[in-house]
Amino acid sequence: MEPFFIEIYPDKDDERKTISHQGEEFILVLKGELMVVYGRETYYLKAGETIYYNSIVPHYVGAHGDDPAQLLAVTYTP
């Protein structure tokens, strides 16, 4: 498992691309708001909220709104 501190800036709508890869991801939002597209679902997370998912499913993670988001991400790759 690898932990990361990440600051994400908002993307333009046409720059939002989903990715998929082996492994699992856990995200804790520290500041701001985050948009997570996971398969066909979209989740909006605020500071203090978390999400955990299998990263083989196509996903996108980006800041929601006009301000950057700060997060702690922990990834596992077999």
Model regions: which residues?
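Flexible loop/N-cap segments at domain edges
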Residues: I27-V29, E49, Y53
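Generic protein-terminus/edge-of-domain signal
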Residues: P10-D13, K17-G23, P68-Q70, T75-P78
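Short, conserved beta-strand element in jelly-roll/cupin
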Residues: E7-Y9, I19-V36
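Short, surface-exposed secondary-structure edge patches
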Residues: F26, R40-Y44
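Conserved short histidine dyad/triad with adjacent acidic residue
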Residues: E2-H21, E41-T42, S55-P58
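Ligand-binding loop in jelly-roll beta-barrel domains
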Residues: K46-A47, S55-P78
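A generic structural signal for short beta-strands and their flanking turns/coil linkers
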Residues: E2-F4, E25, G32, V57, ...
